[in-house]
């Protein structure tokens, strides 16, 4: 079973890689999940570098049924990445009470690829990012994803990179992340 951790920030100065690495380690180090044989792929939207969606396809994403119908090669590549995932963990900062435009752009470039996939949202920010977490979950429901829930991780405002002493403190969220992921796994197996 393949779990994708999609990093929602593309800023040059960001803590998203550290939060995504924390989530990945939490999953990999879980004794409860060790027999699940999970393959974890961290997907960095900064590296994928999708152009801003400007209706470059003749059809809107909801009308596209095959990866080959996308006009843009980066969108075709993105479609293949998402199609290969069984479970998706969105890791996103909260910017001005919302989630980043790059993440919205990446989500909006596709449609059918998201259907039925279990998802959870790990947001972070000075207040945990609960507003963007709720917004993103609503959008994912609209894409017919099976949204299991979200975790809001509070980090010190303006701390880039995260101080070494902060990352171990994130472990208070381990159990919540693992419970949500276990629900995603169960949902995937029961499809």
Curated annotation (Swiss-Prot):
Organism domain of life: Eukaryota
Organism, as annotated: Saccharomyces cerevisiae (strain ATCC 204508 / S288c) (Baker's yeast)
GO biological process, one term: apoptotic process
Function: Has several reductase activities that are NAD(P)H-dependent and involve FMN as a cofactor, ferricyanide being the best substrate for reduction. May be involved in ferric iron assimilation.
Places the protein is found: Cytoplasm; Nucleus
Residues engaged in binding FMN: 11, 94-97, 124
UniProtKB keywords: Cytoplasm, Flavoprotein, FMN, NAD, NADP, Nucleus, Oxidoreductase
Note: Present with 1270 molecules/cell in log phase SD medium.
InterPro entries for the chain: Flavoprotein-like_sf, FMN_Rdtase-like_dom, NAD(P)H-dep_reductase
Protein name: NAD(P)H-dependent FMN reductase LOT6
Reported induction: Induced by low temperature and by cycloheximide.
Top EC class for this record: oxidoreductase
Lineage, uppermost ranks: Eukaryota, Fungi, Dikarya, Ascomycota, Saccharomycotina
Catalysed reactions, semicolon-separated: FMNH2 + NADP(+) = FMN + NADPH + 2 H(+); FMNH2 + NAD(+) = FMN + NADH + 2 H(+)
GO MF term list: FMN binding; FMN reductase (NADH) activity; FMN reductase (NADPH) activity; FMN reductase [NAD(P)H] activity; NAD(P)H dehydrogenase (quinone) activity
Gene Ontology terms: cellular component: cytoplasm; cytosol; nucleus
Broad class of where this protein is predominantly found: cytoplasm
The protein's assembly and partners: Homodimer.
Classification via PANTHER family: CHROMATE REDUCTASE, NAD(P)H-DEPENDENT FMN REDUCTASE LOT6
EC number(s) given by UniProt: 1.5.1.39
């Amino acid at each position: 079973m393949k779990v994708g951790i999609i990093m929602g920030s593309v800023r040059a100065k960001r803590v998203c890689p550290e939060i995504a690495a924390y989530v990945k380690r939490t999953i990999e180090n879980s004794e409860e999940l060790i027999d699940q044989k999970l393959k974890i792929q961290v997907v960095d939207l900064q590296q994928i570098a999708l152009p801003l969606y400007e209706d470059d396809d003749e059809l809107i994403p909801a009308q596209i049924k095959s990866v080959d119908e996308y006009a843009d090669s980066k969108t075709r590549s993105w479609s293949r990445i998402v199609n290969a995932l069984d479970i998706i963990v969105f890791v996103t900062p909260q910017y001005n009470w919302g989630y980043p435009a790059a993440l919205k752009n990446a989500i909006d470039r596709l449609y059918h690829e998201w259907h039925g996939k279990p998802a959870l949202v790990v947001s972070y920010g000075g207040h945990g990012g609960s507003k963007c977490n709720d917004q993103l979950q609503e959008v994912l429901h609209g894409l017919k994803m099976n949204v299991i829930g979200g975790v809001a991780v509070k980090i010190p405002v303006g701390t880039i990179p995260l101080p070494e002493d902060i990352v171990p403190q994130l472990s208070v969220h381990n159990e919540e992340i693992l419970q949500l992921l276990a629900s995603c796994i169960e949902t995937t197996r029961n499809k």
